[in-house]
Amino acid sequence: MAIIMAESSYERRVKALYEKQIRMEALEAKFIKKVYKFNSNLLDVKEAACRHQRKVGKLQKVLMERREELDKRVSFIEELDRELEATKLRDLAMKDRIKQQKMLARQRKNEIMESIHTLSKTTGTYINQDALPARVKGVTVLRGDKRNQLIPFDLKSTDVEGLDSLCQHLESLNVDMAQWQQLISLAMDVAMESRAPTTPPKEATNCNSIIEIDLTSPTCHI
């Protein structure tokens, strides 16, 4: 009887150990499953973190490129502003120079016209400005006690021989040739300047303030 009871107690202990082992194996399997799931989730998280890091790197690269591009645009705009300001200053300086040149040109023209007027009265020579520079047209008046002598001329502006002949003729009549030639030269300069920058007539291409005198015109007396 005692032996039967001892075996029964042993069987219970063995059964309890077996059941405990089964529970431990079940817990171990459950724990292993959880560990596997945790590792799997951890791997997914790591992969997601890597993908995110790659995206962040790409975004940082794009951001850096955009920032460099923006810096270049800012520098370009600043350079344009500086160039624009320099251009404005150059334009103002150019306008001032043009204004000064125009003022000096008007002053010079007024002085020349005054000289022409004075020389015209002194030499008694009157020039047709509309005929210049292609032709030299006018008249020299030699004043006398009883009557005046008129010497008209209408000629091309390149006749050197005609000029020499006229100068000799007027000089023989006591005309101040230095003043007379200065008058013609100034009148020619005014005519040339007034027609610039238009193309000068073909006849005046080689004009050098030289007068052509037509000595075939008769001398008039009044």
Swiss-Prot record:
CC per GO annotation? Ndc80 complex; nucleus
Instruction: List localization entries.
Output: Nucleus; Chromosome, Centromere, Kinetochore
> Is the keyword Coiled coil in the record?
yes
Q: Quick one: where is this thing mainly located?
A: nucleus
Query: Biological process GO terms, please?
Result: cell division; meiotic metaphase chromosome alignment; meiotic spindle organization; mitotic metaphase chromosome alignment
Name the coiled-coil region(s). Answer: 51-86
Keywords for this protein: Cell cycle, Cell division, Centromere, Chromosome, Coiled coil, Kinetochore, Meiosis, Mitosis, Nucleus
**Can you tell me which family this protein belongs to?**
Belongs to the SPC25 family.
Q: What does this protein do?
A: Acts as a component of the essential kinetochore-associated Ndc80 complex, which is required for chromosome segregation and spindle checkpoint activity during meiosis and mitosis. Required for kinetochore integrity and the organization of stable microtubule binding sites in the outer plate of the kinetochore. Participates in SAC signaling that responds specifically to disruptions in spindle microtubule dynamics. The NDC80 complex synergistically enhances the affinity of the SKA1 complex for microtubules and may allow the NDC80 complex to track depolymerizing microtubules.
Subunit note:
Component of the Ndc80 complex, which is composed of Ndc80, Nuf2 and Spc25.
Q: What is this protein called?
A: Kinetochore protein Spc25
Q: Which organism is it from?
A: Drosophila mauritiana (Fruit fly)
Q: Which gene encodes it?
A: Spc25
